[in-house]
Amino acid sequence: MKEQMFANKEVVIMILAIDFDGTLCVDEYPNIGAPNLKLINELIYRREQGDRLILWTCRSGLDLVNAVAWCELLGLQFDAINDNLPEVIEEYHNNSRKITADVYIDDRSVKPWEALLQKVG
């Protein structure tokens, strides 16, 4: 987490790495399932507030292109896709295979977005 000043207020900027299948949508791979609109809307809001979003998925090729296009149709954009943010690479002088993030949101772990949404209201 990094703190930045906006309008004389200290704001914490977080990097969130988000899985696609089973997280942003119902897992129907290789198809795309129904959207998790509660999470998607929260991520759109958080990005508007300055948080950085990374799509972190096993999808590749056309499946990845389709997933990104699907997200964009719902208004969700990412700062990086299956890669570290440029400023992280610059800071550490390395592009690690492990994505650097403050929070990893994935259906194969505890569902952290539920706690995140409860904090927001």
What kind of feature is each model-predicted range?
Residues 1-121:
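HAD-like aspartate-dependent phosphatase fold
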